[in-house]
Amino acid sequence: HLSAEAFAHPLDLIPTLFHELQRPCVLVIDEFLFLEDLQLAHAFHELGKRVMTWPFALFLLTSSSPYRAKMILRERLHLLFGQFEVLSMPSVDPRAAMTWIRETCPSAIRMPSVAEFLLQWIGPSPWYLSVFLRRIQELARLSRAHRSEETIWLRAAWDLVGNPDGPLYHWCLTRVEQAVHQRAGVAARDVLLAMAHGARTSQAIVEKLGTRRNLSEALQVLVEHDLVERKGTCWIIPDQLLATWLLGVLGPRERYGSLDHTAAQRAFEQALTEEWAAWRTIMNRSLSQRLETLLNQFRNETVSLDSKTGRLPAFAALRTQRLDHADVTYLVADGEGRRWCCAVAESRPDENAITAFQAFCAAQQPKPVRKVVVTRLPMDLNAKLLAKACNMWVWESEDL
């Protein structure tokens, strides 16, 4: 009951502060959805009553689970008490996050590739980054053998994510268990594991599981708990760290049963090392090679891209054409009577490059149904507007 008392205490304190100081108050509740886990009857109802009757207090509620947060606000708070406004805050800019990594761990992360992979893997989440960087600093200070940066961050990942005593291990476990304890929970866990192993569509999930039973209910549970997102007909796990935990921790445990410490660490490090190796392979390839690999993975899925919904056809043939006078490569993909034309720019394309690509597409037979511009660097605003006016999709290297 201590947690419930700790929550009730500041609620009781706010009116006293206001009457004594005659100043408005602000109450910030981070991850407010966890109020349900306190041993406090009708936590949201108690909170809502105070929101309604305390005009002198501003309540700021935050959550990293947007779907559930909006549902709670809409169904339990706003409907009864009103006065709630929902704001979606963007995450930390990746460039700012990279600067943070370099400034926080100059001695622990000397290899730029390690820092880049860390950011790509866990995303620009301030909490994930702060926990990781703190542990990397500790290991760097404790290491007298001058272990490599790769070894240090791999050990930090195990300590935080793979080890049952790690804080991020418990975070991932809690998120999955919340879904598993709901309706169709066992099916939801199996579907989540199938997606972590690469199943992107409902059909691919069925092929991995061997059954369609409770699939719709399981997917809905996962969406409600912000574990998966739907992009057209494709399903993704947006939290890459959680996906690694599923591959390296929950997957081996479901497959082999209880594992000793050494076997569990080996399974986790193998999963993470494979991700690291795959990422390094991709990053060492040219942008046009990465795009070609991506196009070869299309299997007639319908997805949401560039704020539009479209089908990704299975291509039968791809050919490239490099321009002599510019740092641009054209790639033409054909499949099922549908042609895509892509312009891959290793530098920043200007308006002339967009105009030239438009002329190239206009000369094609058959006419392309999709025109895509892929750039390594962000495009100039005028060039991007021209590309949009020509009905082109604009992708950056991170999209690949």
PLM-predicted stretches and their roles:
Residues 2-66, 74:
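Conserved Walker B catalytic segment
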Residues 281-366:
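Catalytic centers of nucleases
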Residues 66-84:
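Short regulatory helix/loop adjacent to the ATP-binding pocket of P-loop NTPases
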Residues 208-225:
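Short amphipathic alpha-helical interaction segments
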Residues 241-274:
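Short, amphipathic alpha-helical interaction segments positioned at domain boundaries
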Residues 124, 128-212, 260, 267:
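Winged-helix-like regulatory helical subdomains adjacent to P-loop NTPase cores
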Residues 372-400:
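Domain-level recognition of nuclease-like catalytic cores that cleave nucleotide substrates
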Residues 85-114, 121, 132:
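Conserved small helical "lid"/interfacial subdomain of P-loop NTPases
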